[in-house]
Amino acid sequence: MADFIKHFVVVGGSLAGLFTGIMLSRLSHDVTILERTPAEALAGQGAGIIVHSIVPPIIEATVKLIGSLSPIVDFLEEYDCTHTISYVSLGKCGIQYLKRDGTILNTAVPVGLKELGSASWDLLYNVLRANFDGVYATSYVEAVAREEGGGKAVYLSGARLTSIQDLRHEGVKVDYESSNGSNSSLIADFVVGADGPRSTVRKLLLPQVERTYAGYVAWRGTVKESLVSEETRILLKSKIWTVFHRRGH
């Protein structure tokens, strides 16, 4: 078993990094997650997350690959030991296409979709954090004991990756800077890049790859219902997904 156990360094401690870290740890591997953002600055990342696939091609591909409409729900059922209610079912909602003036152009319900589940980044993050290292807890997510046989799990906040060096048969050397300015190193068998669109891993390993403009800008945020008009509340309440039609924004 000792020869089988590997040390993974996951760069990026948001949802993708935690999904990866939990799975590897439950397979008895040792995992260290490096998250460059300090813990206190992570709260409130993202207004909302739909936990089911809603785009027809993605639905078809997901069902064909894993037989599910929600890999997130499946993952939580398999790995969540906190038994926290992680999403709210919104029923069989559809997608609203709006014109620029706010009127509804069309409403569609993806074929095969039985329900939509809504969660928040904060909720999913806290549930995953509690499941990763067994010492994290919040007012609504309890700490859980580590499962027997699981690998070591370490989550380092404020740890900024600075370099990656292939040591060949000796592994991979990972250098990082802590929030207090000190420099440290880790030796890993594998390094996983899960550090988002501004990936330092990609910048270090594939410096020739540059981000390209997709042709649009997405903005999202939250607003209190009391601050919007009654007409807007009704429009947004009737369907969970509202998108502007092409050439309409």
Regions found by a protein language model. Give the residues of each.
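Extreme N-terminal starter segment of soluble prokaryotic enzymes
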Residues: 3-8
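Conserved FAD-binding catalytic core of PHBH/FMO-like flavoproteins
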Residues: 130-249
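Solvent-exposed strand-loop boundary residues in beta-sheet-rich modules
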Residues: 37, 101, 178-180
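N-terminal Rossmann-fold NAD(P) dinucleotide-binding loop
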Residues: 17-18
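Active-site-adjacent segment of FAD-dependent monooxygenases/related oxidoreductases
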Residues: 40-154
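Glycine-rich FAD pyrophosphate-binding loop
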Residues: 9-13, 22-47, 60, 64
